[in-house]
Structure formats: structure tokens, C-alpha cells
Design a protein with these regions (language model features):
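DEDD superfamily 3′-5′ metal-dependent exonuclease/proofreading module
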Residues: 1-131
Length: 131
């Protein structure tokens, strides 16, 4: 799984750190986001999926019908559940908008994760001393 290797890439690639430790300035739903952030406790890169904001801040989602019960879309299973909710549930328009926004951010981050992996490999392949 890409999500399993992404933290390692982010922790060991100075190229990735330098490029993504500032607002990206491109993209659609992550344009102003900083993908590479340092954990204040251990100095390692924070998993960018954990930086995705909660969808239902200020809304009671105690029922287990919404995603993981916490209102997060941080993995493929939650994304599939969210998409299913959009297709087959009678949702309040505010909740529907929040789910769509969350799915768009999650999907863009998933695509960006593939780009990070590619950029890391490309940097290593072009580097005289990759290790």
C-alpha cells in the first residue's frame, strides 16, 4: 500500500520536504495546504492523511451511519462509504456538501501521494549519491 510507504518517503527525502513544507500553490482542493509538516514531539513528518480536516465539526454524528463515526475520510474504505452515502442516502444538503468536499480533498491527496512517490524515485534515480 502506498499509504504504508508514504511516511518513510516523507521522512527520508529532503527533496520532498523542501518542496512540500510550504503551501503548494497548485491543485484544486489542497492549493493552500502544506503537505509536509513536522510532528512537534518526534520531529518526523506527519502523515498527510491525518492532516485532512474533520467533515462534521459542529454537527452531531453520534450515529454510526456517517463514515467512521468521527467524520473522517482518511482511507479508501471511508471514501467508498462516503460515496455510497452520497448515492443512496437522503442527506441534509450541508452534510452532502461536506462529504463531497472531503472526498475531493481525499482523492486529490491520494493522487498527490502517487506524485510524491514518483518524484522521490525520480530524484533518487537522477542523484549521484541517492543514499
Amino acid at each position: 500500500s502506498l499509504k504504508a510507504v508514504l511516511p518513510t518517503i516523507m521522512n527520508h527525502s529532503a527533496f520532498i520536504k523542501n518542496k512540500y513544507a510550504q503551501p503548494m500553490g497548485y491543485g484544486t482542493h489542497l492549493r493552500s495546504e502544506i503537505v509536509w509538516q513536522k510532528n512537534k514531539n518526534n520531529g518526523k513528518a506527519v502523515d498527510p492523511y491525518k492532516l485532512l480536516p474533520p467533515l462534521f465539526e459542529g454537527i452531531d454524528i453520534s450515529s454510526d451511519t456517517y463514515l467512521d463515526g468521527k467524520g473522517q475520510i482518511r482511507d479508501g474504505a471511508a471514501a467508498m462509504m462516503a460515496y455510497m452515502l452520497l448515492q443512496f442516502s437522503d442527506l441534509d444538503s450541508d452534510i452532502r456538501k461536506r462529504i463531497v468536499k472531503g472526498l475531493l480533498k481525499y482523492c486529490e491527496l491520494d493522487t498527490l501521494a502517487m506524485v510524491l512517490l514518483y518524484e522521490h524515485w525520480k530524484f533518487l534515480s537522477e542523484s549521484k549519491y541517492p543514499c
